[in-house]
Amino acid sequence: MWQGRFYSCPLDQSHLWTALRYAELNPVRAAMLEAAEQWRWSSAAVHCGAAAPEALLAMDRWRARWTAAQWREYLAEGDSPREVSALRQSTYTGRPLGTPEFIAALERSTLRLLAPRKGGRPKKGPPDSRQTNLSLIA
């Protein structure tokens, strides 16, 4: 399931649910079974109401947002290609995935630039008036 690698990135609340759905749908995506809740090593069965929660699985935050029926419906919607692409890009680079406000708050708290910047060298600005024009000297 993890393909021998570990990837992570900071996620805001809405992208947390996207990432959880993505992880729970991995066995389905790999054609290992038809429904996510059938995968024994996943939290999907608990989230879908097909199994009792284990002691290690904290459910309070999840229960505050979802019911088992809502989660089954959310899983049935599947991942959108745009969401999957954004999630993969962020996990490969380690950059945060969230709203601009979320990323700005992380930048303030870490004192680091976290949002991707434009590639390439900086554009040249207007010529500096203090530079000497060598063509006038000769």
Task: Name each region found by the language model.
Residues 1-138:
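Short Pro-Cys-Gly-centered "Cys-loop" motif that presents a nucleophilic cysteine in a tight turn
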